[in-house]
Structures are given as structure tokens and as C-alpha cells.
Amino acid sequence: MRPLAELIRPNIRTLAPYSTARDEYGGQRIDVWLDANESPYDNGVNRYPDPRQQRLREMLAARKGIAADRIFIGSGSDEAIDLAYRIFCVPGRDNAVSISPTYGMYRVAADTNDVELREVPLGDDFSLPVERLLAAADERSKLLWLCSPNNPTGNAF
């Protein structure tokens, strides 16, 4: 099995993270951030939140006993699904494999990102068709979506 970093699209792997003035001058006490149009008066919502959610990831990492850089925090599953396509799949070239029926966002995100989604029907009793899932995958398959418990059937795999 290849390391996860090798599966990331090269242009994504080499991206520099977005940097704000707060990142660059974070060690200094600065009350006014004119570049961000933030208020210096603390009312609970006067600052933009940390886009990396570093403090929360560190707290979760300590609680779960894993490294903070192994934790993803997003705005729900739709964002995570979309980002998986964007990170791992080359538009117009790669594909993903999924069961059917399942959560509809896998299809929406595939279409949005120009990635072929190969849907494999569940068995008549909603069982997981493992051999057909494996047969649907090829060297261009970058994602396999298994929703458990499945939406909309409710069965767990």
C-alpha cells in the first residue's frame, strides 16, 4: 500500500497554506488587525476564527492519543466529501467507487469536480457487494465511499 501523501495530487501536495498577518505576527500582542477589518473591542465575535482550528485539533488529539495533524475539522460531511475529491482525484481522469443507493452528496461532489463515480448496486437484501465493488475499481480509482450505517437504507456494513 502506498503512503497517503503519494496519493495526493502533486499540485495540491505542494500548495503553501494560506497565511494571514496573524500567522506571521502571531507571537506579538496586536489588538488591531486592519488587514482583516476586525474590531479591537472584544465582544465574542470580533475576530475571525482560526481557519486551521489548531487549538481544537490539539485538544482532540490529546484526548484521543493521536497527532493533531491527523485530525480534520470541517463544516460537515459535505465539505469533507468535496475536499476528498479535490485532494485525491484529477478532474476528467480519476474515478471513485460507491454503493447505490447511498448518500447523494457523493454524486453531487463527483459531478462538481468532474470525477467519474462508479455506482455498484447493493444486493436485493441491501447486502454489500464486495466482489462487484472491487471489480468496479481500477488504477484510476482514488476513492471508495462506504456509508455505514448507509443512507438511505439504514443498514450497517
What do the PLM-derived regions correspond to, one by one?
Residues 37-40, 77, 103, 149-152:
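Short glycine-rich anion-binding loops that position phosphate/pyrophosphate groups of nucleotides
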Residues 42-44, 81-82, 106-107, 153-154:
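Glycine/Thr-rich phosphate-binding loops of Rossmann-like dinucleotide-binding domains
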Residues 87-109, 123:
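Conserved PLP-anchoring active-site segment centered on the Schiff-base-forming lysine
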Residues 57-95, 113:
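Phosphate-binding glycine-rich loop
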